[in-house]
């Protein structure tokens, strides 16, 4: 069985798709005004804002009350036939981004038995960054009694040959179009097509072949190859996994092979899609002795012929060569050094997206900045396979408004 499968997808039958679709709950956590606008915009209409708990509300006194209300609203939407069921289907999605490019994806479900978020996992589906396990229990409280799930998870495949999703895109005119509208709050256009029957079967066959050949792609690496990586929403998928494991623990010996909790709805995307841009995240260390830090880095983590990165101290800058033997990625070498150094020496690290902002911050007294290169797309899977996990803040996949909006759903009870 493939690790990514067609699902009985719940598709909303509502008058306003614009009011229905809401951005991922882990965005705009420090901007309550954003969520207030969303609630006001969707007031009185069926909307996913009534089915999710914005992350900003986790751990607040209102959490339990809001969670109970969410579950009641989910049950109400099901009872009132808000959804049309798309049996044994995928949904092909095209999302316009800020720069005008179109990101392609395929909504389906993953087998949680094929996913393990722990560091050093050898499962077919893995996390790209370290999972903060303390963040899972609050999310389990939201999911545990929910009758349906709505995904904001973006899962990635390393399909350089573009054999999985792209053939669906080429034949989309033969598919039933489900939606075409503008997402609220500047999310731009989104379109979706139903992929079922022969089109779904053809995708399943291509995925079977793709999975069988994954080992050849990474034959030069010591680690066990993987099929998919979780790009966005890993803590959401980890929550689904934890709820499933909890169910298994409470029902020893029960056959849960076809239980809805074994699966989770996600959107699969190809890292080699032209719209996928991996932006680097730079490092600045303040409240430190910058020259001492730089000297320690040269002594402990540098080697000739390594990854070249540029450092900035005040108005001075230069290049250093990081030891390739320590990681598949330059950021892996640097972050490993910084983690160890800051345990024994003074300094505070921050993660900066903009080049100019990093240089300006490094001009402060007692500061040093490191400008990192953008990660090549082919390095993502190789980095996880070889190193077990990517360093935190390795790369950024798009801006906040480009994250997935809640749209499709699936029964989990």
Model-derived regions: residue spans:
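Surface-exposed, charge/polar-rich loops and edge strands
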Residues: 1-413
